[in-house]
Amino acid sequence: MVRNINETFLKACKGERTDYVPAWYMRQAGRSQPEYRKIKEKYSLFEITHNPELCAYVTKLPVDQYNVDAAILYKDIMSPLPAIGVDVEIKSGIGPVIENPIRSMQDVEKLGEIHPEEDVPYILDTIRLLTAEMLDVPLIGFSGAPFTLASYMIEGGPSRNYHKTKAFMYAEPKAWFALMDKLSDMVIAYLKAQIQAGAKAVQVFDSWVGTVNVADYRIFIKPAMERIFAQVREMNVPMIMHGVGAGHLANEWNDLPLDVVGLDWRLSIEEARTRGIHKAVQGNMDPSLLLAPWNVIEEHVKGILDQGMKQPGYVFNLGHGVFPEVNPDTLKRLTAFIHEYSKEQLAK
């Protein structure tokens, strides 16, 4: 049975007019929710993602609590890496840690291929469960982008400056492009499998690409992104690109065969469009604002919505993930305000 879903989010991604501005929040399922924190007392992130019923519950929780217009699958960008031979551990207070970092072409050549139905069946089963039985809004699948995945694989974990990653990129270009090719193959297969399982849109997170300048992006990263989006495009679902601190790359993303350019708070929607961004836009509230008094939040959100609504194709989101300290009631109130205010303004 095919479930009827609210397609407002999908319409906005395609640049179509909507009755109100759709909203969802990165990390909407996570540490800000008391129910999630209780689950995390018993289970690790990977244990949750390996349990389709539990993972589906966590994914759906913010949809029920906040009335958002899309769900995003609960998992980590590192989830597919063990399938290609990368030993990943998520350490509390640190993040992903990789014991066997990439240091040479030989290390790159050891990486394998992903076969999603065999390697990550639990992720695909979670998608099938959510889309067949549980959700009344679209489910977003996602992947990390090759640069960000490579940065973890080379640094061995999170970094403040990504010196090792960029040094490898400059000093070992042959190995770098081989790594980009292997990761691109993985991302393409991984995203296609999520769509085949029922995801109605996909987002590619390039969390750390903001550390790279435009010239280097064009040489070392953009070809891989062009290949990913060109090949996933044949699946005919909206594709979203998002990075942090990457406003200087927005025009590069605008050139890619994708549907939605994700912005963080450093580049306003108005400025992005002035620069020639003609695709749908997603963003771009500073998540720190969620810790401010409501009257401050409301004033800022009005300003963001007023910019976003100037043309069709706008999805409200944060510029980064929800902080653990955020009160869930604030997110519920925020969604209601976005819906009410935008509906009123768009009806004029």
UniProtKB/Swiss-Prot annotation:
One of its GO terms (molecular function) is uroporphyrinogen decarboxylase activity. The keyword Lyase applies. One of its GO terms (biological process) is protoporphyrinogen IX biosynthetic process. Pfam families: URO-D (PF01208). It is an enzyme of class 4 (lyase). InterPro entries: UROD/MetE-like_sf (IPR038071), Uroporphyrinogen_deCO2ase_HemE (IPR006361), Uroporphyrinogen_deCOase (IPR000257). Substrate binds at residues 27-31, 46, 76, 152, 207, 320. Homodimer. This is Uroporphyrinogen decarboxylase. It comes from Bacillus cytotoxicus (strain DSM 22905 / CIP 110041 / 391-98 / NVH 391-98). The gene is hemE.
